[in-house]
Amino acid sequence: MVKFLKQNKAVILLQGRYAGKKAVIIKSFDDGNRDRPYGHCLVAGLKKYPSKVIRKDSAKKTAKKSRVKCFIKLVNYQHLMPTRYTLDVDLKEVATLDALQSKDKKVAALKEAKAKLEERFKTGKNRWFFTKLRF
C-alpha cells in the first residue's frame, strides 16, 4: 500500500473537538507503537482562523484580525481526510512527542507553532489553509 499521509500534507480532521478544522501532518507513525497500536500522526492545526482583513482597517485592527490559534495533537488515521495541498512550514522541531508530555512544554510549542503559522499567513502563501472550511 502506498503511504500518502506524509509530512507537510494538509488534512482535515473528521472527529473530536477539532472536527472540520484544517491541520498539517508533522510526523506520521504508519505502523503505530506500543501506546497506540494503530496508524496515527502528530498534527498541528488551526483552532481559530484569521478574520477577513479589509483595506480601511487600522494597523492595530489588521494585526488583531491576522491572529490565529493553533493546536498540536496525535490523531488516528481514521479521523483524517487528506487533501491535495501541502504546507511547507517547518514545524518538525517545534512540535515533538515529548512536547505533548508536559503542560509547560506544550504551551511553549503552541506559541512557536502559532508564530510560524501567523508568519506564513502574513506572507500570503497557502491561502487555502488559512480560510475557514464552509460546510
From Swiss-Prot:
Pfam families, A to Z: Ribosomal_L27e
Record-level Gene Ontology MF annotations: mRNA binding; structural constituent of ribosome
GO biological process: translation
GO cellular component assignments: cytosol; cytosolic large ribosomal subunit; cytosolic ribosome
Key words of the record: Ribonucleoprotein, Ribosomal protein
Family indicated by similarity: Belongs to the eukaryotic ribosomal protein eL27 family.
Name of protein: Large ribosomal subunit protein eL27x
